[in-house]
């Protein structure tokens, strides 16, 4: 009984349209940021290094290099703070988790583009 109600509520909250993306893809995530009374969108562009598919609890981690420092941010896929996700380029990788990119820098950290 309660399980069906929970599933129905989760289905309503998961109604947001999310583009298909995978680890290795370069994405631009538009995040809603509230500063005092104002609310604006902030873009976070980087490589998806991991994805967790758990229905409403799905999440993904994006890594970028900002002024020589590696920055990683984990987003909840269906969070109301995530405004939009745009796939900029597809990456050709063989692993599901790209945590090895944390140890690489410069040209070694590049990902080959998927030609389809």
From Swiss-Prot:
The keyword Ribonucleoprotein applies. One of its GO terms (biological process) is translation. It comes from the Bacteria. Coiled coil: none annotated. Keywords: Ribonucleoprotein, Ribosomal protein. Pfam families: Ribosomal_L19 (PF01245). GO terms for cellular component: cytosolic large ribosomal subunit. GO terms for molecular function: structural constituent of ribosome. Signal peptide: none annotated. InterPro entries: Ribosomal_bL19, Ribosomal_bL19_CS, Ribosomal_bL19_sf, Translation_prot_SH3-like_sf. This protein is located at the 30S-50S ribosomal subunit interface and may play a role in the structure and function of the aminoacyl-tRNA binding site. Belongs to the bacterial ribosomal protein bL19 family. This is Large ribosomal subunit protein bL19.
């Amino acid at each position: 009984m309660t399980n069906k109600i929970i599933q129905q509520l989760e289905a309503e909250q998961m109604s947001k349209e999310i583009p298909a993306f995978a680890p290795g893809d370069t994405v631009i995530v538009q995040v809603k940021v509230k500063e005092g009374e104002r609310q604006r969108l902030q873009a976070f562009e980087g490589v998806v290094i991991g994805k967790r598919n758990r229905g409403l609890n799905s999440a993904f981690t994006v890594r970028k290099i900002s002024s020589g420092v590696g920055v990683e941010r984990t987003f909840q896929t269906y969070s109301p703070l995530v405004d939009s996700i745009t796939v900029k380029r597809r990456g050709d990788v063989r692993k599901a988790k790209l945590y090895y990119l944390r140890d690489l820098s410069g040209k070694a950290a590049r990902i080959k583009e998927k030609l389809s």
